[in-house]
């Protein structure tokens, strides 16, 4: 729950921009080239533009935003993108309103308040590793907080590794003329995660409080090889194969978590 600061009387509109960015990774091992292609096909179907649109529509509802417009696209050979423009203000139905135009407040939001997702399935050419990355951005202007959607987004995707960035920009002015550069209390993105998620993930923070920049990265605590094997069971593998695959997967997870190559 986002805890607001004591209610402020504002001069005009709340001009604070709040942006939450996710990089969510799913890691998998598929032994053959054919299995890796089937993994890509599976991910491409599971997270196509229609499914992503539903997830982002749910996000808009969770944060209390109104949807202005939806653009979505599936790509060949793989991947998908969805962009939703949102606003705080209710949307006027032009069919019902005749020639009535959407209010200036709504139009003013269109370049600032949005939810986007892009997906990137890929595979290693030799070692059997396959990954799926979803990049999600929720940017709002006004009192709407993207932090309300944190838990839903993590639970909606196959989240082995999650990298999150949250920042607040701009200012809003109260009726006495004083500028306010943030309108809610926060010292870590972790403040807004559920107990269930916190219990399952290792987390690491890098925060720059004076700049209103908050960064949290996390990965699953428990490693269950069966959860990472595609179309295979660990019990069907030899001990040597299990150790090799486990080492490859753990290295991949560490490299994605730290954002650099560790084996070189």
Curated annotation (Swiss-Prot):
Post-translational modification Pyruvic acid (Ser), affected residues: 113
Reactions performed catalytically: S-adenosyl-L-methionine + H(+) = S-adenosyl 3-(methylsulfanyl)propylamine + CO2
Active site annotation, chain numbering: 113, 118, 141
Cofactor(s) of this protein: pyruvate
Pfam families membership: AdoMet_dc (PF02675)
UniProt keyword Metal-binding, yes or no: no
Keyword Transcription applies: no
A GO cellular component entry from the record: cytosol
Marked site (Cleavage (non-hydrolytic)) residue numbers: 112-113
GO biological process, one term: spermidine biosynthetic process
GO MF, one annotated term: adenosylmethionine decarboxylase activity
Assembly with partners or alone: Heterooctamer of four alpha and four beta chains arranged as a tetramer of alpha/beta heterodimers.
PANTHER family xrefs: S-ADENOSYLMETHIONINE DECARBOXYLASE PROENZYME
Family to which this protein belongs: Belongs to the prokaryotic AdoMetDC family. Type 2 subfamily.
Protein name (database record): S-adenosylmethionine decarboxylase proenzyme
Organism: Xylella fastidiosa (strain M12)
């Amino acid at each position: 729950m986002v805890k607001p600061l004591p209610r402020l009387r504002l001069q005009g509109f709340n001009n604070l921009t709040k942006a939450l960015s996710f990089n969510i990774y799913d890691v998998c091992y598929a032994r053959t080239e054919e299995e890796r292609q089937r993994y890509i096909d599976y991910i491409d179907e599971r997270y196509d533009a229609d499914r992503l649109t539903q997830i982002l529509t749910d996000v808009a509802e969770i944060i209390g935003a109104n949807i202005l417009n939806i653009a979505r696209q599936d790509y060949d050979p793989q991947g998908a993108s969805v962009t939703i423009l949102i606003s705080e203000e209710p949307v006027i139905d032009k069919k019902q309103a005749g020639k009535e135009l959407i209010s200036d407040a709504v139009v003013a939001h269109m370049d600032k308040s949005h939810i986007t997702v892009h997906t990137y399935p890929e595979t290693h050419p030799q070692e059997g590793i396959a990954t799926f990355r979803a990049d999600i951005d929720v940017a709002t202007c006004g009192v709407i907080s993207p932090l309300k959607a944190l838990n839903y987004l993590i639970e909606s995707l196959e989240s082995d590794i999650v990298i999150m960035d949250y920042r607040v920009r701009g200012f809003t002015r109260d009726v006495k003329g004083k500028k306010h550069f943030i309108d809610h209390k926060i010292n870590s993105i972790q403040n807004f995660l559920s107990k269930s998620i916190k219990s399952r993930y290792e987390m690491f923070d890098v925060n720059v409080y004076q700049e209103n920049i908050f960064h949290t990265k996390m990965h699953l605590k428990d490693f269950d090889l069966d959860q990472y094997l595609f179309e295979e069971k660990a019990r069907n593998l030899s001990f040597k194969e299990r150790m090799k695959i486990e080492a490859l997967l753990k290295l991949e997870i560490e490299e994605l978590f730290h954002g650099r190559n560790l084996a070189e």
